[in-house]
């Protein structure tokens, strides 16, 4: 039985988006997971995962669309002015949580940059990506705003992050169509990003071990994200097709307990164009989708998780 409960840890902020469309697909695993959905402070959201038969437990915390908000700011939540955001607040919450469970997986769904004056040192200092490292973020992906400074800006940012010598989150995105670009001949910008990806170690997916739970995490860059990135020179495969191929590769080559996806695709009221809902339906072996991009909250309202 997969159960879902919802509640706020802290009433001071509006939560960032989380999507997990198809919880019952978890029952295809060798053991059952129980998810507890919690909305919390400063855009940090969490899951607790229990593998009852094997007595495995995993907490997952995640962010997305942080948009260079290294400092907190004032906004209106439920009709009242509240303080939200800020990496110091995030780090405090993470530290408090890790006192209870040090084996916590921390994910980010992209668009970690562009939105405050911090973005002015994006390409030279990689401040946002390095700060994700300080938070203890395990895996992140690219959003459309990571391309705002063009191909050279993204490449310079990745190289600057590596040059810092600091602990950095792993980065995953599975649907970049490198083969098509190589066949057509790299543009200078494509070449810059390709080389920066190699330097940083960007992969289609990565495998993380937390305690006795092994998790594969893949990344997806959505169609609407590409439409919102006019300076992006990269070519991309269909997100669902690329994710399906990557999941099959994971199932073939990795012995993991669950598969998670950090997706910068988003959800919409119209299910026909709601990209991460489509992804969840098209690739049911993905157990968890962290959905960024649209800054919306998709509520799971079905009385039965089998629906």
How would you name each of these model-derived features?
Residues 34-42:
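Bacterial N-terminal signal peptides
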Residues 303-307:
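A short, hydrophobic C-terminal helix/tail in secreted or cell-surface proteins
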Residues 52-302:
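Acidic, metal/ion-coordinating pockets
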Residues 25-31:
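Bacterial N-terminal signal peptides that target proteins for export
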Residues 6-23:
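Short, Lys/Arg-enriched N-terminal segments with co-localized hydrophobic residues
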Residues 43-53:
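Sec-dependent signal peptide cleavage junction
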